[in-house]
Amino acid sequence: MFRSMIVRSASPVKQGLLRRGFASESVPDRKVVILGAAGGIGQPLSLLMKLNPLVSSLSLYDIANTPGVAADVGHINTRSQVSGYMGDDDLGKALEGADLVIIPAGVPRKPGMTRDDLFNINAGIVKNLSIAIAKYCPQALVNMISNPVNSTVPIAAEIFKKAGTYDEKKLFGVTTLDVVRARTFYAGKSDVNVAEVNVPVVGGHAGITILPLFSQASPQANLSDDLIRALTKRTQDGGTEVVEAKAGKGSATLSMAYAGALFADACLKGLNGVPNVVECSFVQSTITELPFFASKVRLGKNGVEEVLDLGPLSDFEKEGLEALKAELKSSIEKGIKFANQ
């Protein structure tokens, strides 16, 4: 969660915004790059990262319309300096010196589409962007939002391996929206404050590969087995719920931007040495037989400091864990195969 912060010189209105935002006063300079900054997720994500005082330089890149987004966001009176870059020739300039690269680039879901339907378009985009990251900012942390995350993270890993720059501690699939949804849905059925809720979500980032661990939720609430099953299903189908509600006019752009900003903030805190920063993310992992898996990870100055064990699972969660493995394995292999074509 974002921690409250107080900027003594801020106006009351600005203080109100920032208390709901991020953290800290005296912090190192950090350059954050958003690839796909002019898109449905990229624009609100750019706004949220502009509000984050951990960011000193905000570099916005897209294939079109980035100058306008940069000019708009750049007028906001917060710490970071904003630069806009557009087109292939500017990609290197956008990336140079980055501490953190966030990738929401690609096409959004439409009604009837699954995340895997996006593969043929978004896989190529992620491959090309990963080649550029390996060339211009190989030491940066990379937060992958572009779907299908279960495949795009392995694509990026393979591209980085080919370039000789791969560091498994620095590549993250952003699954935070699954956690955000699980928290919201759980609180809605429990007599608890949603701001105090935490629910680990493990596995992957599509359909049945999303496995919320409601047995480990805090604060604990006495929910029936049927309700836990319903909450699990709703968490898994949360993206589809939004796509259908928008009736062809978009996907989960605003909540995804919020979740992406949450995870980016956690990564920046880790880089800055804040202790005990733990978030769920889809990373290279040995906690199952699969090469990538989403679970709780401890973040630090080098990215992933520790991949945490799954902890005790209910019988329902154990069943879900076994059920998701085949689909997740297939998605991972699909990404690896694409990257090596």
Swiss-Prot record:
Disruption phenotype: No visible phenotype under normal growth conditions, but the double mutant plants mmdh1 and mmdh2 have decreased germination rate, grow slowly, are small, have increased photorespiration and die before producing seeds.
List of catalytic residues: 205
EC number: 1.1.1.37
Sample GO molecular function, one term: copper ion binding
Catalysed transformations (reactions): (S)-malate + NAD(+) = oxaloacetate + NADH + H(+)
Location in or out of the cell: Mitochondrion matrix
Protein's name in the database: Malate dehydrogenase 2, mitochondrial
EC main group: oxidoreductase
Function: Catalyzes a reversible NAD-dependent dehydrogenase reaction involved in central metabolism and redox homeostasis between organelle compartments. Required for carbon dioxide and energy partitioning in leaves. May limit photorespiration during the dark phase. Can convert 2-ketoglutarate to L-2-hydroxyglutarate in vitro.
Tissue-wise expression: Expressed in rosette leaves at low levels.
InterPro entries in UniProt: L-lactate/malate_DH, Lactate/malate_DH_C, Lactate/malate_DH_N, Lactate_DH/Glyco_Ohase_4_C, Malate_DH_AS, Malate_DH_type1, NAD(P)-bd_dom_sf
Binding site for substrate: 109, 115, 147, 181
Gene Ontology BP, a term: malate metabolic process
Pfam families: Ldh_1_C (PF02866), Ldh_1_N (PF00056)
GO cellular component labels: apoplast; cytosol; mitochondrial matrix; mitochondrion
Family of the protein in this entry: Belongs to the LDH/MDH superfamily. MDH type 1 family.
Presequence positions on this chain: 1-22
Keywords attached to this entry: Mitochondrion, NAD, Oxidoreductase, Transit peptide, Tricarboxylic acid cycle
Top-level taxonomic group: Eukaryota
Positions of NAD(+) binding: 36-42, 62, 122, 145-147, 256
Residue ranges of the TM segments: none
Quaternary structure and partners: Homodimer.
